[in-house]
């Protein structure tokens, strides 16, 4: 009997395998599936806007080489972020700001806002304050929002000023040098966002004992996702939300 349900699904950068990642069109695609749970990435632009993009530069997604931190949000919005997209997409998709993404998302149920590793304590402080400002402006709630990062120094900095829940993003790079659960707890995190390969039965048991909910990334095989939910995962971050929905509909509990 399957354990995976629609409620477990979180769209990765929108729906990365089915629509251009981290774009307004991609997020609309996710909403049109009836999914209002999303993971996305933000960076600071030159003019301190929170822009939604995964990489520190624009080459992979737009075909144009610009450093996000050295480019204004207005100039980033002139680029078309469908360059890497593997599916047909009829319209251009500019790099959006976080405000543009969330100001039109009326029924948001859950969002993981991921901050990529930052270079210095000074930049961490700036990011933490700008993120807090934008979260307040957007009226983001602790019921819907988690600030996530693999940069645990940033998490500690942000946690000092931002009351929203925080989550540690952990993969082999962290797990090889430290216990992800201990790092999450020492960083004041409320969620462990774990690479699914690390979610063994022993890890699942340890997370339960630590009372630490787990969100797994990036799971694109439905059988694996179902197994992870059986082990206790609270949510599954996937590039293929529509494909997962179809499987769930064909395998009712």
Language model regions located:
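Phosphate-group recognition and catalysis centered on beta-loop-alpha active-site segments
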Residues: 1-253
């Amino acid at each position: 009997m399957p354990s995976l349900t629609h409620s477990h699904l979180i769209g990765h950068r929108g729906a990365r395998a089915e629509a251009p990642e981290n774009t307004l069109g991609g997020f609309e695609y996710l909403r049109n599936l009836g999914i209002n749970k999303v993971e996305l990435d933000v960076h600071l632009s030159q003019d301190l806007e929170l822009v939604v993009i995964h990489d520190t530069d624009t080459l992979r997604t737009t075909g144009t080489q610009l450093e996000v931190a050295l480019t204004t949000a207005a100039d980033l919005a002139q680029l078309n972020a469908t360059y890497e997209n593997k599916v047909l997409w009829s319209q251009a998709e500019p790099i959006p700001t976080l405000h543009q993404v969330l100001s039109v998302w009326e029924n948001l149920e859950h969002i993981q806002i991921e901050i990529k590793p930052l270079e210095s304590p000074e930049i961490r402080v700036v990011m933490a304050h700008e993120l807090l400002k934008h979260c307040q402006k957007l009226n983001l709630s602790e019921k819907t929002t988690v600030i996530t990062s693999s940069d645990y120094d940033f998490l500690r900095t942000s946690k000092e000023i931002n009351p929203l829940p925080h989550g540690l993003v952990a993969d082999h790079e962290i797990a090889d040098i430290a216990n992800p659960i201990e790092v999450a707890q020492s960083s004041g995190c409320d969620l462990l966002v774990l690479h699914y390969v690390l979610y063994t039965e022993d890890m699942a048991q340890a997370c339960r004992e630590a009372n630490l909910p787990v969100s797994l990334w990036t799971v694109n095989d439905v059988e694996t996702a179902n197994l992870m939910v059986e082990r206790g995962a609270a949510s599954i971050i996937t590039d293929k939300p529509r494909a997962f929905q179809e499987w769930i509909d064909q395998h009712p509990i």
